[in-house]
Design a protein with these regions (language model features):
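Histidine-acidic metal/acid-base catalytic patches
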Residues: 3-27, 82-83, 101-104, 110, ...
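Ligand-binding pocket scaffold of soluble enzyme catalytic domains
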Residues: 20-66, 72-73, 79-88, 92-93, ...
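Short, flexible loop segments at the rims of nucleotide/cofactor-binding pockets, characterized by
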Residues: 30-33, 117-118, 230-231
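Active-site-proximal loop/turn and secondary-structure-junction residues that shape catalytic pockets
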Residues: 34-37, 59, 94-97, 143-147, ...
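A diffuse structural propensity rather than consistent per-protein peaks
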Residues: 38, 70, 183, 308-310
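A short acidic (Asp/Glu
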Residues: 42, 66, 151, 221-222, ...
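Non-cysteine beta-strand/loop elements that form the S-adenosyl-L-methionine
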Residues: 51-57, 91-93, 141, 211, ...
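Structural motif corresponding to the early beta-alpha repeats
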Residues: 59-192, 196, 203-204
Length: 367
């Protein structure tokens, strides 16, 4: 198969480009999903122990009639990241983000609108093909209608500011989204339509597609016309249902540990067993690590070391289940003295790196 311009596409496992060193045993690594637009940012990542960086190829020029990446654009992004001794194995699709559907430039897939969604799905096929040609082995995306819901920011330690979500404080006077009334069955039908058409292409080109669960789950009775954020229902049941749909080694999760905690009524007890079961599927392709204080419908995001989820235990479980991809810090708290959050993310990088090293020592029988 070819992409625009006639370039022949190879499967990612047999492609040109540097990518992962085939002689290095697979293992967990410290990653980041933070966007890097200059060498200084890449060097900041490298200094703090990051090995793998999620890439953001240029947004396709829709005004010129092209809605997908060219392989040359993905290659340029990959080469830029690799120039500082880092790896790019995952790219963020140019649409299907964690955006309120009303603000989305390309909402047709989530609205179930044909033929527009078929055009957008074809563009995703071409993005997957472009990644395969240059050795990018994964892409990540969301299936979001409501975007990331928050209700306030509250004070945290050292004068930091923390994201809060309380279902009771949502503004229930807001109208439905442009999607109108969407019950759970309809939401699943739209996800199924997407997976049915994209998973075979992911398999053909050996590029893994990784979906982030909706953040957070919807309150009882739904919100703004959406009955249920279906991947984020209590007990993690939506995640297992999602993985069973069009089951494939190339269809999986960009699993956010914080979002998983947010969908549970008793996260401090429930999360470890659910994570182990998900780990055994071998369908987690990336991890976002954040912590919370609270439970479903009422939580505050915290610093990674002070929440109710034991992140060292999380990383030990991932190691025990053979997880061998990146772990990225996520939603680090804000502070006025740290407008770019470089201080906060440095804390996150160090915390994760220490936990990974601890898990490796534990696995090697060292104390």
């Amino acid at each position: 198969m070819t992409v625009a311009g006639g370039a022949t596409v190879q499967a990612a496992g047999h492609s040109a480009g540097r990518g992962r060193n085939p002689n290095r045993p697979p293992k967990m690594v410290l990653g980041t999903q933070r966007r890097a637009s200059d060498v200084a940012t890449l060097q900041y990542f490298k200094r703090h122990g990051v090995e793998r960086v999620v890439g953001y190829p240029p947004s396709p020029p829709l005004s010129e009639g092209r809605g997908y990446w060219l392989a040359s654009e993905v290659a340029q992004t990959k080469e830029f990241i690799e120039s500082q001794g880092l790896e790019m194995e995952m790219a963020t699709l140019p649409f299907l983000g964690s955006t309120l559907v009303d603000r989305d430039d390309r909402p047709a897939i989530m609205l179930g609108q044909s033929p527009e969604r078929d055009r957008d799905i074809e563009d995703i096929h071409k993005c997957i093909q472009a990644c395969a040609e240059v050795g990018v082995t994964s892409v990540k995306y969301n299936m979001s209608l409501l975007g990331v819901l928050s209700t306030d920011r509250v004070p945290g330690r050292g004068g930091s500011s923390l994201r809060q979500f309380r279902a009771a404080d949502l503004d229930y006077s807001l109208p439905d989204t442009i999607a109108g009334k969407v019950d759970a069955d309809t939401y699943w039908e739209r996800i199924d339509y997407f997976l049915e058409r994209v998973v075979p292409v992911a398999e053909e080109y050996k590029v893994r597609i990784a979906c982030h669960p909706q953040d957070p789950g919807t309150p009882p009775g739904g919100y703004r016309g959406v009955e249920e954020n279906v991947l984020s229902v209590p007990g993690g049941k939506g995640l297992f249902k999602f993985l069973k749909m069009h089951s494939s080694a190339y269809h999986g999760l960009n699993l956010c540990v914080g979002t998983l905690a947010e969908m549970l009524w008793n996260p401090a007890d429930e999360i470890y067993d659910i994570l182990r079961r998900l780990g055994r599927t071998k369908r987690i392709f990336n991890i976002h690590l954040r912590n919370i204080i609270g439970r479903r419908d009422d939580f505050v995001e915290s610093w990674p070391d002070e929440g109710i989820v034991d992140h060292a235990r999380i990383i030990n479980i991932l190691a025990e289940e053979g997880y061998a991809d990146a772990i990225d810090p996520d939603h680090i708290p804000r502070h006025d003295d740290d407008p770019t959050r470089e201080q906060g993310y440095a804390h996150g990088y160090g915390f994760i790196l220490g936990a990974i090293n601890g898990a490796e020592h534990r696995g090697n029988g060292r104390s």
